[in-house]
Amino acid sequence: MPKRLDINTILVIGSGPIVIGQAAEFDYSGTQACQSLKEEGYKVILVNSNPATIMTDTATADKVYIEPLTLEFVSRIIRKERPDAILPTLGGQTGLNMAVELAKSGVLEECGVEILGTKLSAIEQAEDRDLFRTLMQELNEPTPPSEIIHNLDEAYGFVNEIGYPVIVRPAFTLGGTGGGICHNEEELIEIVTSGLKHSPVTQCLLEKSIAGCKEIEYEVMRDSNDNAIVVCNMENIDPVGVHTGDSIVVAPSQTLSDREYQMLRNTSLRIIRALGIEGGCNVQLALDPYSFQYYVIEVNPRVSRSSALASKATGYPIAKLAAKIAVGLTLDEIVNPVTQKTYACFEPALDYVVSKIPRWPFDKFESANRTLGTQMKATGEVMSIGRNLEESLLKAVRSLELGIYHLELDHLKELDKETMKKRIIKADDERLFIVAEAIRQGVTKEEINEWCEMDFFFLQKVENIVNMEREVKANVGNMEVLQTAKEMGFSDHYIAAAWNKTEREIYDMRKENNMTPVFKMVDTCAAEFESATPYYYSTYADENELIVTDRKSVVVLGSGPIRIGQGVEFDYATVHSVWAIKEAGYEAIIINNNPETVSTDFSISDKLYFEPLTIEDVMHIIDLEKPEGVIVQFGGQTAINLAAKLEEHGVKILGTSLEDLDRAEDRDKFEAALTKLGIPQPVGKTATTVEQAVAIAEEIGYPVLVRPSYVLGGRAMEIVYRQEELLHYMKNAVKVHADHPVLIDRYMVGKEIEVDAISDGENVFIPGIMEHIERAGVHSGDSIGVYPPQSLSEKLKEQIIEHTIALGKGLNIVGLLNIQFVVFKDQVYVIEVNPRASRTVPFLSKITGVPMANVATKVILGQDLVEQGYGTGYHPEEKEVYVKAPVFSFAKLRSVDTTLGPEMKSTGEVMGKDLTLEKALYKGLVASGINIPTHGSVIITVADKDKEEAMEIAKRFHEIGYNLLATAGTAQSLTEQNIPVQVVNKIDSEDYNLLDIIRQGKAQFVINTLTKGKQPARDGFRIRRESVENGVACLTSLDTTRAILRVLESMTFSAHSMKEITQTKRHEVVHA
């Protein structure tokens, strides 16, 4: 069927900010969809709130709206633009929920807008647990025994009948939010209450736990002619019970017999047909390992995280084709863009094994509960490709960027058998490493299978790796053993440690013996047809499929998995850099391992290498490609950390030199540079011992800011107020020694300013200056940023511009630099300089129209700023106000303190823009998920040091009509200031207390500033966590609270009696 000609304009709904459960995969799918629809001649309008994406670039769609994804704003855009149709299935759960809300509100009917791809009835049938269960019964498809519940009493009824354990699955939620496995009544109360709160329709499915079954996923496509295919089937190494986003996944499935494969394939196709989905769909199934009994777990009637993985695993671009199907094209009409010969109705075939390992944020949140269940906790993931599962797994392990090069963790070697058993039974993020350790210590595969029901096939593969370790250690210098180890995916790093040599010595030894990997192509058809796509992976085999051209090439290092501190912003910069390299006439080569991102879409670069970002894996590519050089500025700390090793191998680092990179990162060298340039910075020193740290802090005076050198995202950074806190930090947060010094600075309570600039060594161009709403001390990634600055005097702005230009030239920066300043007592101080792309590059690029990563790349390639039409100086400021607001995923991470400080905690960001600061802030806050009601109650409980400041805030809340609630101490201070307040009991009271008010939804805001000593038992911690669990905005910074007050005050009409007004006027006349 040809494409539809009765529609012209299509509104694509994006997925909003990155949160746990919904990450960069929707930037990839949304970008693909917009381009795909434009190719077919449709006018595309995009709405998304996330400025850090390629999707929200003006070139992606005909019109781009960066606005909150709420009914209020999306309805306004629909009424203004009058699209013929909307496509919501590429915006994740956000897009689906938005489509349902728009339909129910009547806006779609009012404006004559059609839903494309997946009809509303199919969305509701797949997402509403009751309707889905009914459909499965009609199809005779087995589902676990289950019950739909809307309250706790109904949950008790089901459990009394079926017994524990039960799984709670809330309806219309993302990444299993609010759900979990209940083993007893206490867990049932907690998880059901949470699930009902998080479900927008207050509905949960309770089902008998089938934990222990194999979990299998089928990624399927269907068109309007009822052609349906399986793009990819995947198997979770972790059995049912761990969310698929937190599971280690392999593709294709490894342990299914042909009968099992065909049985589950037929079921998946039957389901997509019954739902009438036109596009992509993900079906999750459970299979009993001892019989042919299977169960349908759930269906995602949209493009998902698994679709992105399946697309990268097979080379089959699901989102691109789903968009074409949505406008009426059929699979047998669409040419496969990989082979450019076959059609999209051919099912992909794989002659390799793909492994996906999640990347969790537990290195950031040490207090978080690491147990894995049905609620997702990973922020991102890595993917690797190999010719066997062992190779594929080990490549994925070293892609995680946790300083791990092999399936072993030193701290697990001390575990006894009983501890290992407990941790293997109750899965956590280290389970596969513990399984390997158990096998090393002689635990049998049978015992491990009994503990966790992981398939014997996977346990055998882990045992193969452990047996090979013994071979390697027993045969030092043996080339045959080395060859076998390399074929199994062992890294030079591991072999070097086993043979007591350096990694470079192993690398040289292999080269002398011609022991290097070959590169194979990902072609969707197992080499049956010729492929036109240069998408490669390395393996130790005979035939090399790589074609090295004569063109001059440049390598860009990607930023690896999404994690807190290094998000999609770096992928944005990477993609723009690749495009600039192509524009400059070079062959653009990218190395990355993140299946979710736009940068690993094979159509972006001239060559894509899906490889770990380690020195060994990168050098294999460089040895073959022999590029002009490597750009490390856009891949975050991942790429910067490789710069020194690459230079040791004789590789040219393009842009800012290694020496100058080091000068910006090394404390003493940086201090010397600032002194030479006459630029002030907070008083600070470097400590290499605990004693030294104590002495420095005494000399500088508390409070001090302490952090390790060379960090990203404020990792292990803290403000300490007294000596005992400093000693706790030095013993627990960092391992201090001569090679890893700790930096100690005077903490200045001032206004923080952030600047991004581009330097060519001679000229320094400043696209924008941003002001942070929160004072210095809250990580820049967690602050609300405002452009243009609203409270900076011209004199201070000039100082900042002068310092930025001096730093760009003085540090010999070639490319991008990011500087953070603090304004303290009308003086500008430099806090830090990052000689690379920062997380504000996409935001400022979109606002100012300066494509910063593109311009910087061309500078790096030798085209100076003047040639590109830019000179030294500050770009004229825009008239509108733009706000960048952080988005957090605390609801997914139990036991994590929500207090903001110098260590970054946000997972994503949104943008609000309007004519005034208040309106822009309103949009930013609403887009970030903060509800802003114009009246209600606010609980105020603050530390003693903040009481004076909190009084003014409380007074303003009272004046706009809010009720004030406070515990005795704070209430007394308010009463003394004649501010009406209701006293509430502290949380240790057995009577109705502060936590009850939060649980019952009777407070709209909680203002709670940190009481020191962050152990979870603290009252402050419990209040903050209770707020998160109950969806109440908890404000831990008084600066953020003031920003919200500005918005509330701008929304509130004043109400004064005539007498008050007359008295005020009389007072003014008397005093005139």
From Swiss-Prot:
It comes from Bacillus anthracis. It catalyses: hydrogencarbonate + L-glutamine + 2 ATP + H2O = carbamoyl phosphate + L-glutamate + 2 ADP + phosphate + 2 H(+). Its EC number is 6.3.4.16, 6.3.5.5. SMART domains: CPSase_L_D3, GARS_A, MGS. ATP 2 binds at residues 707, 746, 752, 777-780, 820, 832. Mn(2+) 3 binds at residues 820, 832. Mg(2+) 3 binds at residues 820, 832. Residues 930-1072 form the MGS-like domain. Mg(2+) 4 binds at residues 832, 834. PROSITE patterns: ATP_GRASP, CPSASE_1, CPSASE_2, MGS. The keyword Transmembrane does not apply. The keyword Repeat applies. Mn(2+) 4 binds at residues 832, 834. Pfam families: CPSase_L_D2, CPSase_L_D3, MGS. Residues 547-929 are annotated as: Carbamoyl phosphate synthetic domain. This is Carbamoyl phosphate synthase large chain. Residues 930-1072 are annotated as: Allosteric domain. Pathway: Amino-acid biosynthesis; L-arginine biosynthesis; carbamoyl phosphate from bicarbonate: step 1/1; Pyrimidine metabolism; UMP biosynthesis via de novo pathway; (S)-dihydroorotate from bicarbonate: step 1/3. One of its GO terms (biological process) is 'de novo' UMP biosynthetic process. Keywords: Amino-acid biosynthesis, Arginine biosynthesis, ATP-binding, Ligase, Magnesium, Manganese, Metal-binding, Nucleotide-binding, Pyrimidine biosynthesis, Repeat. The gene is carB. Binds 4 Mg(2+) or Mn(2+) ions per subunit.
